[in-house]
Amino acid sequence: MKIAILGYGKMGHAIERIALSRGHEIVAAIDVDNRSEIDSPAFASADVAIEFSNPTAAFDNCCDALRRGVAVVSGSTAWTDRLPEVRKLVEERGGSFIWSSNYSLGVNIFFELNRRLAAMMNRFPQYAPSMREIHHIHKLDHPSGTAVSLAGDIVEALDRIDGWTEEEG
């Protein structure tokens, strides 16, 4: 498979290493320093663009790849208020797009457990959900996309709450 990488930081390097070890070809690795290469024939030849950049670049990265006919798998977070625009572009262009706040199998099992537990809590109004997350010092977005997904699923499943806040208490 021909893969373009959008965001060539820690995750981009890890994706490259794994992809190459499995016999895939990296046709482009786009970052802030070479953003114009997204217009290159090499980028357009990709079967998929794997996008792990940052909140300020993710939306444009996804849209630019889709406009060039390249399918996108994105794991960047803290920009998803613009997901509806990306989905509209996918529909208009007949493109392919997958986004998740976390691709870890273990975390996705945790997401499902979280949804089930939140639904069960509807029967117990004496309990209120609360969440606290701890990260390494280099974490760029906080709350993390994983925490935002968990909180959103709780809000969706619990009839007695209609939102969440980052404030403690």
Model regions and ranges:
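Anion (oxyanion) recognition and catalysis
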Residues: 20, 66, 91
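Hydrophobic beta-strand scaffold residues
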Residues: 26, 72-73, 96-97
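Rossmann-fold NAD(P) dinucleotide-binding segment
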Residues: 42-48, 52-76, 84-86
